[in-house]
Every structure is written in structure tokens, then in C-alpha cells.
Amino acid sequence: MARKKTITREHILAAVYEVVSTEGFSGFTARNIANKMKTSTQPIYLEFKNMDELRNVFIDRVTAGLRNEVYERRFTDDCIVDLTINYVKFASENSVFYKSLFVDNHESGEKLNKFSHDLFFEKVNSDEKYSKLSTEVKEAIFTNCWVMSVGLSSLAASKRANPTNEELEHMIKNMINMSIEHPDVTLTR
């Protein structure tokens, strides 16, 4: 009779979360993850073909959680302001995890950038206030607000600033208005 599997995919993903949220992606190694579970690396490779597959599954799980839990909270009647407030709050409450995901350079950075871009466009395209704006203006709003959000989030994560929702709303609305008036913005990615 075969041995019963005691370490599941969920256990491994929980260990990955613990590692990345405390050490960042620099700690994303089979050995560190196995140590977190107090086991060998064998269960990891029984569940996942390789570390790239594990990273992709983990990032998919994280982005689903961000989409469904973090970015769905409403604070105002403006979807862009709400995205920013949620992003800054996430950074402030999960500073190491935020930096690991959105600041540090790692293999999933492009995937996370695409997630942020796609989520922004999903929100603005389904909002009456923004849906009729040109793609150029929406891109300008995204780029300007994204840069501002990353800066504010980095300040909040490092406890150098603690902006209130009202302050964030005021800054983002100013940035939206500037982007609408001056949409000629590019950012090489």
C-alpha cells in the first residue's frame, strides 16, 4: 500500500506565502520552503514540475486574492481612488510582502505589472465616469496614478508616511485631472 501524502499543494503554497512575506523572493528556494514545512524538498517536486511552476501558481493565487479581497473594498465613489487606497493600505499592512511583490525585481514582476494594468482597465472600462475616455487618456491616468501609487505605497510600507484616505483621494483626483488635461505621458517598461 502506498504511503498517504501528508504534504499537499495547499501546504506548500502556504509555506511559500510565509517565505515570501517574510524574506521576499530572495528566499524563494525549494530548501527554504521545505524548511518552513519541516520536510525535504521532495514533496515540492511531487506537486510541482519545477520552481517556475510553483512561482506561477503562487502568483496566480496572490493576484486572485488581491483582486477578490483587497481591491474590491470601496471607500469612495471613484474606482481609481479606491484602487489607490487599497494598494496603499495593502502596502502599509503587509510591508515585506508588498515590497516582495511590487518593488523588488523578480521573475514574476512583468506578470504583476500586467495584473495591475489589466485590473485598472477592467475597473475604468466598467465605470460610467471613465469608460468613454480615450485609450490614450486612460493610459495616461494609469501611468501617472500607478507611479504615484507605488511611491505612496513605498512611503507607507516603510512608515515614512501615513496618508489618510482623504489625502489619497485628493492627490489621486488631482492626478486624474492632470492626466485628462495632459495625456501625453509615456513610461518605458
Question: Can you say where each PLM-predicted feature lies in the sequence?
Answer:
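Amphipathic alpha-helical packing segments from all-alpha helical-bundle domains
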Residues: 105-144, 170-180
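Basic, helix-initiating cap at the start of DNA-binding domains
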Residues: 1-23, 32, 53-56
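Alpha-helical DNA-contacting segments of helix-turn-helix folds
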Residues: 53-62, 70, 101, 105, ...
